[in-house]
């Protein structure tokens, strides 16, 4: 997972039959969701370039999300209290009703690592993501809180919940789906080289879904993720998609 590179991710989601686009931008993630306790280290910048696309699909099921460019940095010089802030650029994110481009999203996350509160304590993180710049279009303003713990021979497990703008977090049928739970897991297959990760978010909305994939750490400060992502509401996000995610710390 992105826990070693603790990155920013945002994913464009769309409802093709309505000609509408929406998006969400997140802080450090596991795979598809923010189900992770990690926070970007102080003074370390992170660049993420993420793509999602269908595989061997014919129209109208074929499609791809616009490429996401995300930048994040840790801003607190403390070991036990950490904070990251990030921005994502999603071009072109056009509101079909007005023709306006609303590509920028902000996010932040506070956290404290495992063992910082007392011996054996879980890591804890909380923050907001998909802080959009256009009211009633991109301001999902989703709050999330997570707790995570390393378990020998199993890996790390992260559990938490999210809640956002009830006017935007809805199903494809218009039902309010503003809250849900998230769970994530990651484990090294080969230390500092290959890692497997999986996650899931509940809710028939733009957030709901998950998947599992493989991280290849091809350099000390860089990784590539590949794997499938599945969605709870195909009416919002379309068919399942393959993701490739490049992450670089500097």
Outline where the language-model segments fall.
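Glycine-rich phosphate-binding "P-loop"
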Residues: 161-181
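Alpha-helical interaction elements
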Residues: 156-160
């Amino acid at each position: 997972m992105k826990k070693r590179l603790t990155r920013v991710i945002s994913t464009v989601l769309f409802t093709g039959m309505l000609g509408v686009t929406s998006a969400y931008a997140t802080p450090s993630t596991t795979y598809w969701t923010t189900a992770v306790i990690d926070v970007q280290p102080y003074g370390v910048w992170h660049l993420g370039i993420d793509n999602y696309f269908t595989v061997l699909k014919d129209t109208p099921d074929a499609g791809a999300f616009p490429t996401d460019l995300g930048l994040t940095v840790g801003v607190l010089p403390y070991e036990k209290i950490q904070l990251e802030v990030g921005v994502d650029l999603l071009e072109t994110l056009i509101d079909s009703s007005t023709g306006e481009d609303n590509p920028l999203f902000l996010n932040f996350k506070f956290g404290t690592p495992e063992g910082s509160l007392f011996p054996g304590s879980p890591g804890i993180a909380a923050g907001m993501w998909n802080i959009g710049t256009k009211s009633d279009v991109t301001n999902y303003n989703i709050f999330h809180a997570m707790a995570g713990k390393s378990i020998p021979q199993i890996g790390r497990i992260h559990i938490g919940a999210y809640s956002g703008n009830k006017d935007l977090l809805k199903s494809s049928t218009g039902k309010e789906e503003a809250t849900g739970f998230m769970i994530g897991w990651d484990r090294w297959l080969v230390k500092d080289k290959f890692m497997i990760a999986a996650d899931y978010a509940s809710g028939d909305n733009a957030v709901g879904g998950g998947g599992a994939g493989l991280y290849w750490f091809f350099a000390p400060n860089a990784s590539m993720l590949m794997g499938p992502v599945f969605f709870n509401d195909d009416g919002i996000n379309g068919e399942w998609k393959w993701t490739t995610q490049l992450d670089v710390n500097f």
